[in-house]
Design a protein with these regions (language model features):
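Conserved ABC transporter NBD signature motif
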Residues: 63-71
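ABC ATPase nucleotide-binding domain "signature" region
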Residues: 38, 84, 147-153
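Helix-to-loop junction immediately C-terminal to a conserved catalytic motif
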Residues: 55
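Conserved ABC ATPase "signature" region
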Residues: 71-73, 106, 113-131, 162
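The feature captures the beta-strand-to-loop junction immediately N-terminal to the Walker
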Residues: 40-42
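A short, flexible loop at the N-terminus of ABC-type nucleotide-binding domains that lies
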Residues: 1-33, 74-76, 109
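Conserved ABC ATPase signature
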Residues: 135-139, 143
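Short coil-to-helix segment of the ABC ATPase nucleotide-binding domain corresponding to the Q-loop/switch region
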Residues: 95-104, 135
Length: 166
């Protein structure tokens, strides 16, 4: 992960007038390359909003986001090279475990041989190898969350992996 610098605030209102109008009060934060960080706070305090701003799913109403010294505030999620693992597993029930893990790589045009190798590595790491040919629809919630995690980890070009209450 490249160094991440945040100097932002976010409101869903056009002209916030008070602290209560903000989903995220003005903040400045720095996350160094290679670190592991946790955002702690009560429900509704803005943790998910901040993760969505970092990943590019939401644009902050004020301020900027920088990766490795480059401003990415207006860049798409794809251009940011971020993987996000959401609280509720994001998988395709109509696909097998292997197809779910391969999905991000196929969408980026990775060669089939590389996809097979990388899917195998991730499946082994997450103890999903025995289930690769199983339909995702029949799996328990914890296995579905592992698949969601695997989809975040399968790409070797990811700058950061964000976990939202996985």
């Amino acid at each position: 992960m490249a160094r991440l610098d945040l100097d932002l605030a976010h409101s869903y209102k056009a002209n916030p007038q008070s602290d209560e109008d903000y989903a995220l009060l003005p903040l400045k934060m720095c996350f160094d390359d290679g670190g592991a960080y946790a955002l702690l706070g009560p429900s509704g305090c803005g943790k998910t909003t901040l993760l969505n701003i970092i990943s590019g799913l939401i644009r902050p109403s004020q301020g900027s986001v920088h990766f490795g010294g480059t401003e990415v505030t207006n860049k798409t999620p794809q251009a940011r090279n971020i993987a996000q693992v959401f609280q509720f597993p994001v998988i395709y029930d109509t696909m097998t475990v292997a197809e779910n893990l391969a999905f991000p790589l196929r969408n980026r045009g990775v060669a089939p041989a590389q996809i097979k190798q990388r899917v195998g590595q991730i499946a082994e790491m997450l103890e999903l190898s025995a289930q690769l040919d199983s339909p995702a629809s029949g799996l328990a919630a914890d296995a579905k969350q592992k698949i969601s995690l695997g989809r975040g980890l399968v790409r070797s070009d990811v700058s950061a992996v964000l976990f939202d209450e996985p």
